[in-house]
Amino acid sequence: MMPFFPHRVLKRKMTALVSPHQDGQIIAHLLKWFHITPINGSSNENPRQSALELMRALIHGYDLCISPDGPRGPRMRMKKSPIYFASKTGKPIVCACYSSKPCKIASTSWDRTLIPLPFAKGVFALSNPIYVPEGLDDDGVETYRQKLERIANLQAQECDALAGNPVIEPADVYDFKKKEG
């Protein structure tokens, strides 16, 4: 449902970073169905090249779809990369989320992904554009990261409540780091 939204409703050109591996290529194929241009890349393998490709897309008028908690979590904890992209390009960040019912919540995955079931009804939410100043120091980046994380998580809670789903809470950062280490 979410991939359908930008092209059909907002009439925007969209791109998203997808893994060059087999699972990512399945996602890339699906994104093309929704008129979202996939960029093959990884935040692990050659992240600088991936960042350059994403910057080029932004400069050429594409909006960038980023999962703000990254490919490995922790769940619902914003990474810094959206803030860096916005700061470098002057493009705003718009937090977008959805919830639907009926759905399946992937309870065994770290991110508790919500998967809409056929004929589900959905709720979408978009924040107002959030502009990030150029040249932020580390404290400024962290301030914006926390602000965006709060906005995105409140939106997700509102969408879940409107759809009649249980609220999925952000992961405890301390517990997540303990499991990784």
Predicted region positions:
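Catalytic core of membrane glycerolipid acyltransferases/transacylases, capturing the structured
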Residues: 1-45, 89, 104-106
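Short, well-ordered alpha-helical scaffold segments within catalytic/effector domains
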Residues: 24, 48-55
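A conditional alpha-helix N-cap/helix-loop micro-motif detector
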Residues: 44-48, 75
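Non-catalytic C-terminal accessory region of glycerolipid acyltransferases
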Residues: 10-11, 33, 52, 56-181
